[in-house]
């Protein structure tokens, strides 16, 4: 058997094993991301609540799609002293001294998903700096980016990998409303 044939045979036999190892790593990374998103309570704000027979429940058909585009908010809520903020019944709109913030659509929808143009590194920078794509406008309350930003690079990469593969939900979240 000549060396060229031996090399090609070895490469052909090893390629599926390499691909399998990569798929396993990716699958493990996505599972880790799902675990972190779930236990990190991302659904609490990024998945709208709907009223059911037992009270509010997450609308999993809209999982992680942010503030529903059909619910229009035009101005910050006015709250009496000593309160400083208010939230919508869907838990996707928050109003306070910063104005009104709407939870982002974290799904990979190519038109409306906030992460559609992010690289993995930009996602990590966003979580570490509190700025969109690591350099844009600041992320508004109640997003707990200072704590999420303390996650390891591997954990943030896992979260990003998970968010990139969840079902896309077309939902255009409005821009924040500045304070009056």
Task: Give the ranges of each region predicted by the language model.
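Positively charged n-region of N-terminal signal peptides that target proteins for export
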Residues: 1-5
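Bacterial N-terminal signal peptides
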Residues: 6-16
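Electrostatic cytochrome c docking/interface patches
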Residues: 19-38, 50-56, 111-112
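The canonical Cys-X-X-Cys-His
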Residues: 33, 39-49, 159, 163
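Residues that flank catalytic or metal-binding motifs in active/ligand-binding sites
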Residues: 38, 102, 139
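N-terminal, post-signal-peptide region of Sec/Tat-exported proteins
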Residues: 43-72
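Electron-transfer interface patches adjacent to heme c in soluble/periplasmic c-type cytochromes
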Residues: 62-122, 146-156
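C-terminal capping alpha-helices of c-type cytochrome domains
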Residues: 117-133, 145-174
